[in-house]
Amino acid sequence: MFSYYFQGLALGAAMILPLGPQNAFVMNQGIRRQYHIMIALLCAISDLVLICAGIFGGSALLMQSPWLLALVTWGGVVFLLWYGFGAFKTAMSSNIELASAEVLKQGRWKIIATMLAVTWLNPHVYLDTFVVLGSLGGQLDVEPKRWFALGTISASFLWFFGLAILAAWLAPRLRTAKSQRIINLVVGCVMWFIALQLARDGIAHAQALFS
């Protein structure tokens, strides 16, 4: 059964490693050393719920609900544009230390709300967990399926905690004005690039829906 565990671990790692909204948010919280362990835990738990839903049959709801998929897609577009704008605004600030200090004033619940939006308003998360993992893990028997799911869940926990801890450890180097400008510019570009991709997918879905 360990072979199924390592298959899930490898596939989960391959899907989670690319820089996306979730990873960027966890990394930034780690650099700020602001609730970064809590955010890593909540991201991992969110992935656990999504992975279990995808592998154990919940994918049918999203795949059979084009209106729900469209709602998630366009909600993600709006959120990513807003999040990217905030990153660009911080990067272009004449006093980036002051701008970063303003961000640090955010309360715990606002940070949690942002994390939930980053995770649950990203349609790529549903495609990864429901379509990819659901199609592969859903074909397995009950016991192998559990080991496969455990492997993918392990990848999420290892990655998010590792990213948060590593970012916090490197914080003294990454919190310089130059590093913060570069990081925020990269994050802004990634967020807007993903938003444009989602908008393109959303237009295609709308055309198919009304054709």
Swiss-Prot record:
The keyword Mitochondrion does not apply. Its main location: membrane. Pfam families: LysE (PF01810). Keywords: Amino-acid transport, Cell inner membrane, Cell membrane, Membrane, Transmembrane, Transmembrane helix, Transport. Induction: Transcriptionally regulated by ArgP. Lysine has a negative effect on the expression of argO. GO terms for cellular component: plasma membrane. The chain crosses the membrane at residues 1-21, 37-57, 68-88, 111-131, 147-167, 182-202. It is found in: Cell inner membrane. One of its GO terms (molecular function) is L-arginine transmembrane transporter activity. PANTHER family: ARGININE EXPORTER PROTEIN ARGO, ARGININE EXPORTER PROTEIN ARGO-RELATED. Belongs to the LysE/ArgO transporter (TC 2.A.75) family. This is Arginine exporter protein ArgO. The lineage of its organism: Bacteria, Pseudomonadati, Pseudomonadota, Gammaproteobacteria, Enterobacterales. The gene is argO.
